[in-house]
Structures are given as C-alpha cells and as structure tokens.
UniProtKB/Swiss-Prot annotation:
This is Flap endonuclease Xni. The keyword Ion transport does not apply. It comes from Vibrio parahaemolyticus serotype O3:K6 (strain RIMD 2210633). Pfam families: 5_3_exonuc (PF01367), 5_3_exonuc_N (PF02739). Binds 2 Mg(2+) per subunit. Only one magnesium ion has a direct interaction with the protein, the other interactions are indirect. The lineage of its organism: Bacteria, Pseudomonadati, Pseudomonadota, Gammaproteobacteria, Vibrionales. Its EC number is 3.1.-.-.
C-alpha cells in the first residue's frame, strides 16, 4: 500500500484562521473554522497518515536563539485567548482523527523536517501544509509543500520565480540575504539580486568564498562577514535528525475518533 503522509504546520494554520475572526476571544469559532479547513484538506489530499505539529512553547525561541540571540526577538506573542484555547483545538482535531505532536525543546519546523524527509527518503509521498517558505529547502520528487490559503504549491517553479535559486540552495540564499522577519541579518550589502547572482555562479557560500572567481564587489563583503553568513545559513537550515519517538503506524489516518 502506498503512503501519503500529510503534516500540518499547526500554529501556521491556526494563527491565520484566528486572525481573520471578528472576535479574537471566540475560540469556539476558531475551532469550527479550523475543523472545516482540515475537512477540506483531508478531502483534497486523501492522506493515509496525518499529524499536526505544534510549537509547544511558542515564546521559547529554541536552539537558534542560543546562537543568534536576536532570532525572532520581535515575533508577536500569541493572543492569550488563543493560547488558552490550544488544548481545546487539539482535542477537536483529535476527534477528526488528527493527532498532535508537541515540540519539546525543538522548533516545530525541525520536527516537521525530520518526519517529512524520513518518509520521503523511502520514496513515499509527503505533503507539508504551511505557508512557510522555509520548508521549500526540503523539496524532492516525493515531498511537496501546500500553501492552503493561497491555493498554490510552493514547488520548484515557485522557488525559481520567487528567489532565482534551487531549493537546495535556499539556506545559503538566506545566509547571504538574511531573513528580516526573523531578525536573521545575513551579509550586509548582499540582497536578493546579489545572492541570486552568487548562487547562480557557485553552488553554495563556501564554494563562493573559496573561489578566486568571486566578483570583487562581493569578495570584500564575504571576507568581512563570512562568519555571519555561515551562522545565518545554519539558522536558516532545517534540522532533519530530531528524535521523534513514534512511528508511522501511530499516525495512520483511520477517520474520526470518538470524543472522550
């Protein structure tokens, strides 16, 4: 039997649904709306296995903040009513047949990346449901990213149009340009156009840095800021070796569960 694993980036979905509600304290409405969303996802994707991955403590910025203290420093805190309603949301999703994985000390992104690449590496189909373009570095013939809200696939043609590089070069791209929304600085003076030019000529940051053929206008910047580039690439890259503590059988989709 062929496998199709769907991984829901839970807070990515929930926060977008919640922010569109007229009354931010009406968590019941948020629950109902997310359930309708999940019903459509289930209908479209027809998964054999499914799981929703949550950042357990969103205010804990994880290991990336330990090596880059400003990382996501300006992230808006989750609204208190929504924070208080997460358990109820997880219960409602469980009743739909979707279990939750809570990150403990690891960023949810790394858990998603580990699970997705592990399954895809065996030739099985994986769909990550998220608007987060950071997942696009994982793209492979059997691993796809679905932006549910824009009704689009974040695929290789999208990455080429958006960034001008290959999915496998995205961490290097962000190492050079930085990620302003997450307070990742990158290399001063290197923006998207320059990063695209560098990564069209060279496979990655290290190849560019080691080459005598790097354009002089970029050589000075890399010479001065190579450690920042390396650090920012490390922060932008997803970990794919997190201990998961469960197997696929545990997240097989068998339909709705009975409410406890």
């Amino acid at each position: 039997m062929s496998i199709h694993l769907v991984i829901i980036d839970a807070l990515n979905l929930i926060r977008r649904v919640h922010s569109a509600q007229p009354d931010p304290t009406d968590i019941a409405r948020t629950i109902t709306t997310t359930q309708r969303t999940l019903t459509r996802i289930l209908s479209e994707a027809k998964p054999t296995h499914i799981i929703a991955v949550f950042d357990h403590h969103e205010q804990d910025r994880g290991w990336r903040a330990e090596i880059l203290p400003d990382y996501k420093q300006n992230r808006k805190p989750m609204p208190e009513p929504l924070m208080q309603g997460l358990d109820a949301i997880q219960q409602a999703w469980w009743e739909q047949g979707i279990d939750s994985l809570l990150s403990e000390g690891d960023e949810a992104d790394d858990l998603v990346a580990t699970l997705a690449t592990k399954v895809a590496s065996h030739g099985e189909k994986v769909t990550i449901v998220s608007t987060d373009k950071g997942y696009c570095q994982l793209l492979s013939p059997t691993l796809q990213i679905r932006d549910y809200f824009q009704h689009r696939w974040l695929d290789e043609p999208f990455i080429e149009k958006e960034f001008g590089v290959k999915p496998s070069q995205l961490a290097d791209y962000w190492g050079l340009t930085g990620i302003s929304s997450s307070q990742v600085p990158g290399v001063p003076g290197i923006g998207p156009k320059a990063a695209k030019e560098i990564l069209t000529q060279f496979e990655d940051i290290e190849a560019a840095y080691a080459s005598d053929e790097l354009a002089p206008k970029y050589r000075k910047k890399l010479d001065e800021h190579i450690e920042s580039a390396r650090l920012c690439k490390r922060v932008a890259a997803l970990k794919c070796d997190i201990e998961l503590g469960f197997n696929l059988q545990d997240i097989r989709f068998t339909g709705p569960n009975k409410a406890e």
